[in-house]
C-alpha cells in the first residue's frame, strides 16, 4: 500500500525525514535548480530511505536524429540535450554529493520499427524545428521513412534508473 502526490521537487511540502522512498521518473533534467531539488529530496527521505530516478544517456534513440538529418541536415529534433543537464553519464557526479551510495541500473531495451507511420508521428511530436522542414515535403519524407523501415529500423534505448541511498 502506498500514497502518491504530484508536486514540484524544488519545494517539497512535507517535513524532514517523512518518506521511505521517492521516485522521479524522467523529470530531474527539467528542474531549474537541480541542487535545490536534490537537497529537498534528501531532506524528506528517512535515514534509510532510497531515491529512484530514471534518466537516459547520450545514445538514447540516436538513430532517429540521424534519420531526420539524412533527410534534411537542418532538422534538429530538440535544441535541448536534456541528458547533459541530468543523464546516465553525469548522474553519478550530480547525485553523489547528496547520497551515500548511487548505483546505475540499465534497462536493456531497443526498438525495431517496421512501419513508417508511428515513427513519423513520434518525429513530428518532438520539440525541435522538424515541422518547418518536413510538413511541406511530407510525401517525400513519408517515402524516405518507409524505405528506412521496410526491413526494420533499429533504435537504441539508452535508459535506466539510479538508486540512491541516503
Identify the function of each model-found stretch.
Residues 1-15:
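Conserved SAM-binding strand-loop segment of SAM-dependent methyltransferases
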Residues 20:
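Conserved acidic residues
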Residues 23:
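A conserved beta-strand element that flanks and buttresses the S-adenosyl-L-methionine
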Residues 26-30:
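Short catalytic micro-motifs in class I SAM-dependent methyltransferases
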Residues 35-50:
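A short glycine-rich, Lys/Arg-flanked "PGG" loop and its adjoining helix->strand segment in the class I
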Residues 50-77:
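Conserved class I S-adenosyl-L-methionine
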Residues 82-166:
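Conserved Class I S-adenosyl-L-methionine
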Amino acid at each position: 500500500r502506498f500514497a502518491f502526490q504530484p508536486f514540484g521537487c524544488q519545494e517539497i511540502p512535507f517535513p524532514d525525514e517523512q518518506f521511505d522512498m521517492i521516485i522521479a521518473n524522467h523529470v530531474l533534467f527539467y528542474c531549474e535548480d537541480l541542487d535545490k531539488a536534490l537537497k529537498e529530496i534528501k531532506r524528506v527521505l528517512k535515514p534509510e530511505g532510497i531515491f529512484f530516478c530514471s534518466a537516459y544517456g547520450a545514445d538514447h534513440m540516436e538513430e532517429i536524429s540521424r534519420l531526420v538529418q539524412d533527410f534534411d541536415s537542418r532538422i534538429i529534433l530538440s535544441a535541448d540535450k536534456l541528458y547533459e543537464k541530468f543523464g546516465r553519464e553525469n548522474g553519478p557526479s550530480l547525485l553523489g554529493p547528496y547520497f551515500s551510495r548511487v548505483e546505475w541500473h540499465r534497462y536493456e531495451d531497443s526498438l525495431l520499427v517496421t512501419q513508417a507511420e508511428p515513427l513519423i508521428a513520434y518525429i513530428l511530436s518532438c520539440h525541435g524545428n522538424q515541422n518547418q522542414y518536413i510538413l511541406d515535403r511530407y510525401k517525400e519524407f513519408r517515402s524516405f521513412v518507409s524505405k528506412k523501415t521496410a526491413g526494420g529500423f533499429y533504435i537504441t534505448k539508452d535508459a535506466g534508473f539510479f538508486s540512491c541511498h541516503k
